[in-house]
Amino acid sequence: MATLCLFDMDGTLTAPRQKITEEMDGFLQKLRQKTKIGVVGGSDFEKLQEQLGNDVVEKYDYVFPENGLVAYKDGKLLCKQNIQGHLGEDVIQDLINYCLSYIANIKLPKKRGTFIEFRNGMLNVSPIGRSCSQEERIEFYELDKKEHIRQKFVADLRKEFAGKGLTFSIGGQISIDVFPEGWDKRYCLRHLEHAGYKTIYFFGDKTMPGGNDHEIFTDPRTVGYTVTAPEDTRRICEGLFP
């Protein structure tokens, strides 16, 4: 019976929004000789490629962009799901309008562009804007740790859209993921149900309640590990697969 190591990307395999290091990339290819490996991220496929390499689908047995709403196995596309068909245009517009008006009322040291990114399986909402520089990203993240900007935004969204079948979770350093209930990272597990794995190990950094790794981390189908950085991920894997 085979095992699978399933990794979050940002903060687990790479530094947030940075490319994977050669050392980590090489380590994972060695690990692949001992176990199947997969990556699951909230980001879209292009961002996974940017960070893990254009050949990501050849390097991992499973690649699950957008929490597995887009799924690749052994280099081939398995399926693609979309949010607009599921929620309907009215709910999506209400959500976008509400988020833009909320962001317009927050005073931050800096605001940039791309406050909402529309993906296949989710909306990604960023108070500072996704086009901020790396320095601006870190500045916002440090401020957010003190002032809980995203936490308050999420609490507000949960109240405003209660009963609409939506989940709001804090993702990465600068944004909030919004998706239908059940479309969190656990969604990718449905592609693995009949694959016959004895154990699915999951590694992620945002495993606390409200973090976008929490649901899959606590799911009974996985054995979850909380990591703090790629080095930590490597250390745990070396312990599991000496």
Curated annotation (Swiss-Prot):
Modified residues (N6-acetyllysine): K145
Keyword Acetylation on entry: yes
EC nos: 5.4.2.8
Predominant location category: cytoplasm
GO BP term (any one): GDP-D-mannose biosynthetic process from fructose-6-phosphate
Protein role: Involved in the synthesis of the GDP-mannose and dolichol-phosphate-mannose required for a number of critical mannosyl transfer reactions.
PANTHER family xrefs: PHOSPHOMANNOMUTASE (PTHR10466), PHOSPHOMANNOMUTASE 2 (PTHR10466:SF2)
Protein name: Phosphomannomutase 2
Organism field: Mus musculus (Mouse)
